[in-house]
Amino acid sequence: MSRLSHSEVHMVHRIGWLRAAVLGANDGLVSTASLVVGVAAAGSARPEILIAGLAGLVAGAMSMAAGEYVSVSSQTDAEQADIARETRELRETPEAELDELTRNYVARGLDESLARQVATQLTEKDALGAHSRDELGIPETVTAHPIQAALVSAATFAVGAVVPLIIAVLAPAAQITLFVAITTLAALAVLGGLGASAGGAGIFKGAMRVTFWGALAMAATAGVGMLFGVVA
């Protein structure tokens, strides 16, 4: 009975949207909070801080969307080019492709007769799928989706960027830097933990690594803000 009810959920199925979501939200938090902290540390008033933060949100979301779309599109183009070439080779030289698939399975540990049998059966069922998966290394579960990655990155960036802006609105004017920094570090810890948990990694490690880099980014921009604030 346990065999019949057994099912597995693999983390690799989530890798496309998970990568874009975590990267987008993390970047939105860190970049916008760092911008707010830097401008506030320079002695700017609340309206200037909010304008800078809102501009950073819009520009960052668009940049993330464009960057993810271009990056993933390039990956997709490469995959499609390889698949097109494999399709042509399967049509023009099927025996050579069968031999190639057989050698692939022999290299993985099967004896030659069994490898030939496996290659033949998989070719009869779905030749292109077998070659794409076992020769080119392009499994269907991780095929790139440019539009999905772009939309997820832009949306999650905006969600992450909203957090420091809300704090900048609500915090006392003289303590915007402190409130934004503390809230952002807490949000980064939660985000890192959730991302690590969704990906099957350690929660503490995931939380600590994003918190460290977020703190470093805010410290650097605060230093820049204080330097120019003093000069001004």
Per-segment meaning from a language model:
Residues M1-A20, V72-A154:
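Cytosol/matrix-facing amphipathic helices and coiled-coil assembly/linker segments
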Residues M1-S71:
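Internal alpha-helical transmembrane segments
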Residues H13-G24, R46-L54, L114, P146-L151, ...:
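The feature identifies polytopic integral membrane transport proteins across all domains of life
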Residues G28-A33, S153-V163:
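Core segments of transmembrane alpha-helices
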Residues A174-A187:
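Structural signature of hydrophobic alpha-helical transmembrane segments
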Residues V190-A215:
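Interfacial loop-to-transmembrane junctions
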Residues A222-A232:
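Juxtamembrane boundary at the C-terminal end of a transmembrane helix
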